[in-house]
Amino acid sequence: VEQKKIDTRRRRYMNRQVYNPFLPLNEYIPDGEPHVWGDRVYHYGSHDKEGGYTFCMQDYVVYSAPVKDLTNWRFEGITYRASQDPAYPELKYMYAPDVVRGNDGRYYLYYCMGGDYGYGGYTGPISVAVCDTPAGKYEYLGHVQYKDGTVMKKYICFDPAAMNDDGTIRIFYGTQYGYEE
């Protein structure tokens, strides 16, 4: 009986649509990470599909606006698709990304993927893609690694936040239980 109540609440929750006041009504970007580069604000985040059966599905999109006019948002397009990650081509869910400008002037997209219907089924390390512009087409670069070059896989990490701290790129992330490599 308790499980039935939980399932009913979950279905009711997943059937509600929440709207963002500055995006078109069919667009949803949770886990937002706004960044100012040049004279524009760029809004990164997960991407929910209108009427989708779950969340964080298949791609990332970016919107931007002039710093001095946050009522004038522009759709920059799809910047990265799940299918571009060669390590996990079968995974469809892309969670809470972040972008940082590197010391070389390029932009680095940090993200994690999963395959368990958007309910925290994280299955791999944090990945990174790179682009020459904040809202261009990002290309897969690899996985986050330790200084010795080994992929950071001791823990299942998710929702990376990245920053450039006076030339040192720092990544903060959530984690679940560890697993053996």
What are these regions (language model features)?
Residues E2-E181:
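Carbohydrate-active catalytic/glycan-binding domains of CAZyme proteins
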